[in-house]
Amino acid sequence: MPAGANGHIKPFSGAHQEKDSTVKYRICSLAAAVTLTVSGACAAADSVAYPDKPIRFIVTFAPGGGTDIFARAIAVKLTEAWGQPVIVDNRAGGNGNIGADIVAKAPPDGYTILLTTNATIVINPHLSKLPYDPVRDFAPVSQVATLPFVLLVHPTLAVKSVPELIALAKAKPGALNYGSSGGGGGAHLGGEMMKTAAKIDMTHVPYKGAAPALVALLSGEVQFMFVSILTATPLIESGRVRAIAVSGLKRSPALPNVPAVAETPGLAGFETDLWYGMLAPAKMNPRVVDKLYTETRKILFQPEFRNRYEPTGTQMVGSTPAQFAATIKKDLVKWGEVIKTANIKLE
């Protein structure tokens, strides 16, 4: 730049000044456009206009079971909170594999969500070849609740405790049938773990969900089975079945007079439990995942919701997506070891 007589810098003028102004204008215009675009995108992402249409909950078991009951309760509350219908779509079969595969292949837009159990996500991978990867193909939203199983027997079966059941099975090898909500589920594993630990011979009969399995138990088609405490409680109270044990390491506060299987001599350390989890297709917008998690957690800890389900022995969890992802990885290792040690295989 040329200097004036007083030594100060003279500004450009004429063509130079016009060119400089044009460049500055273009730069400012571009900056403004970028700013508007970025701020607009950020505003859209932050607001997440979700949901703006009905949401479908894929439940991996038949209507009437614990997973279905819990999913419908959450769906009702989400519908109330968001003003959009949350529709439960039961896709039973393959111990949850059919429904899980639907969600794994669904668009990651937040409108197809999986409600399932640990059987589908952390047990099935050790027992059969799956069309989905439990870690790679899903975005964990929240582990919503955990609960023990209850060992139920048909009231005509002359046993009132696990030791008596084992004694009967030993006296009549192969004569007793036990049901489950599907091969490879926690109820199936519970039966196989008991079979291995107690060295007894009994036959596993899998069904497509807890509801049809319970029908079989009530009709006497099977003599006993492990059932989630949520599903079992009303049947126990009605006297239609007899509870002889719970599957946790300790007794459940909901059934304080029912011993744990682990109290049985020779079965110390016995434990099989159930959790309900919410997952979405992989690569879903993290803000949508967080919105779904946040609203679900609010529902789980509403006094009305807790008062309805915690007396049944259902423990609300409401874990974050990151916590749930860690639980899945941990439980994949845990159940892999259990299945290998007990040499459990699907029929």
Which stretches of residues belong to each language-model region?
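An extracytoplasmic/periplasmic, membrane-proximal ligand-sensing/linker region
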Residues: 8, 17-20, 52-54, 197, ...
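Short, low-complexity disordered leader/linker segments with a strong preference
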Residues: 1-52, 163, 347
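Extracytoplasmic/secreted proteins, especially bacterial periplasmic and envelope-associated proteins
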Residues: 69, 73, 77, 98, ...
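A ligand-binding cleft/hinge motif common to bilobed small-molecule-binding domains
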Residues: 120-129, 188, 193-197, 224-258
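Hinge/capping helix and adjacent helix->loop/strand transition within the periplasmic-binding protein
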Residues: 105-111, 118, 125-212, 261-266, ...
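N-terminal (or domain-start) structured segment
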Residues: 44-136, 175-177, 183, 199-223, ...
